[in-house]
């Protein structure tokens, strides 16, 4: 049987509905890692710009160049074995970077260049699955807010629980000897803010 291919605008041949060959997919990723822009990769390999962008986006998300299964589930790149090795690397060296973990996975033969997780995937694993183990109080332990601070005596809720500064009774309190005021202030820190402030003003 003949495979009928179509020619895109760049002169490249493709089969509609079928994924791009893995050799070309790998070449796209390699060129991108060399710093070549997707539009230049597109022209060089005669692959549409949308296809190049899609393959690179998938690689950045999953770390895999392999196409998704047609009509099936996507292959899991972060298998339990990979997660275990990432956890071991992190526990052995808490300061290790995600890209260093990626290099270790390749060097130790845990993954090959076709299925090694991307740096962003490793970072997500560290954050979601290992963060609570490796950094219990670190930046990955998010979501916990510090306990609220107690309201200050001058909070509007406690502004003038007793006679206000314009009330003659407050003026009378301010005219009293200042001796009992500190004691009252210490004993009832939220009950005498206005009397204390009036005493300070009147000397």
From Swiss-Prot:
Residues 81-129 are annotated as: RED subdomain. GO terms for cellular component: nucleus. Its main location: nucleus. Residues 3-129 bind DNA. It is found in: Nucleus. SMART domains: PAX (SM00351). GO terms for biological process: embryo development ending in birth or egg hatching; regulation of transcription by RNA polymerase II; sclerotome development; skeletal system development. Disulfide bonds: none annotated. It comes from the Eukaryota. InterPro entries: Homeodomain-like_sf, PAIRED_DNA-bd_dom, Paired_dom, PAX_fam, WH-like_DNA-bd_sf. This protein is a transcriptional activator. It may play a role in the formation of segmented structures of the embryo. May play an important role in the normal development of the vertebral column. This is Paired box protein Pax-1. It comes from Gallus gallus (Chicken).
